[in-house]
Amino acid sequence: MIYNDRLGEVMDLNTLIKIIEKVGRIEIEDIKITADELIINIPSAPPIVIPQTPSIKEKLAEEGIIEIKDVPELDWEPPVEKYPGYIREVQFGKPKSEGGRGKVVKIGGQRALYRFEEPQPNPPVVTFDIFDIPMPGLPKPIRQFFQDVMEDPCEWAKKCVKEFGADMITIHHISTDPKIKDKSPKEAAKLMEDLLQAVDVPFVIGGSGNPQKDPLVLEACAEVAEGDRCLLASANLELDYKKIVDAAMKYDHNVLAWSIMDPNMARDLNRKLVEAGLDPNRIVMDPTTCALGYGIEFSINAMVRLRLNGLKGDELVNMPMSSGTTNAIGAREAWMNNPEWGPREYRLPLWEITTGITMMMCGVDLFMMLNPISVKTLKEIGKTLTTKPGEVKLNTNNYEWIVSP
């Protein structure tokens, strides 16, 4: 039954249907429908059909210009290259049975450049950057994760390990720079000792970038971390690299050899480190990482040349490589507040991830990074490099994101 409030009448549904059939159209206002059961059928929007447009070849065939013949299926194998050389394997940390703190991380060991040639034995490793003093210049998309722990490097390291699953930690002793706080090597060593007690993952030990102070800081920190197989970062031709080599040999550590996008410079530095007595199996190269849009092509060129030369048998460059992927956050497109570029919370990790993936394709083994989102993503991508093609199932439905309006 249908009741019209305005007219105060009750109308039978059949009567209403007859009226509609007679006039063809009727508008109803202010009505109430009373029914034991009411079924309303609302037609759904028709599905979107992807138009199938003929290819150029099919159009030419229709016009009689060409004739399409069945092409037999051919077997195809990727062009697998066999290399006479190999990339050395470098270990960070030691098991407790050997006097270490337990956690062990290995990088390198490859015998090919591409995954389809041969999966690499060890996945790429990401090490979280932390600093010995708060860094006010860090962009907000990074500060939001660490604002509560930036005053305490030990708590910062714990958060990276416990909440974000860090495999390694890089500590930058920024405060030792004479132009900042000029903290002594002894103070840096005390902090290093506290960090070793706070977390059990291997460390990359960095200085402030001051060529006079860094060798002294790295030597002091290497002593308190004796036997833990850390990575001393870094030795270069502009400072007393022999002091760093001596500390690495005396206290059982590895050395990061830093050069500036020049394979010849990297090779020369490695040669000098070896001549100073350092085992080549203790060297990790850092050819310098330029951010996406800020010279990344120069880094690509240097890293691919170093990796290929190492695989071809040059034993002065067949070491694993490291990337300061954090450099990507210095790109203004990553951190600058510009609504036209989209949210910074997305742009910054995307810039760091893209820079990292690019370096990964060049053969980089160790990534120094800051943003937890970037770290998680790059670690997941890196796992695929240890698998054979076909073992990882990919979603090939390119139209899955298209929905009806």
From Swiss-Prot:
InterPro entries associated with the record: Ac-CoA_synth_d_su_TIM-brl, ACDS_complex_subunit, CO_DH/Ac-CoA_synth_dsu, Dihydropteroate_synth-like_sf
Biological-process GO terms, alphabetical: one-carbon metabolic process
Superkingdom as given in the UniProt entry: Archaea
Family, as annotated: Belongs to the CdhD family.
Subunit structure: Heterodimer of delta and gamma chains. The ACDS complex is made up of alpha, epsilon, beta, gamma and delta chains with a probable stoichiometry of (alpha(2)epsilon(2))(4)-beta(8)-(gamma(1)delta(1))(8).
Protein role: Part of a complex that catalyzes the reversible cleavage of acetyl-CoA, allowing autotrophic growth from CO(2). Probably maintains the overall quaternary structure of the ACDS complex.
Listed name of the protein: Acetyl-CoA decarbonylase/synthase complex subunit delta
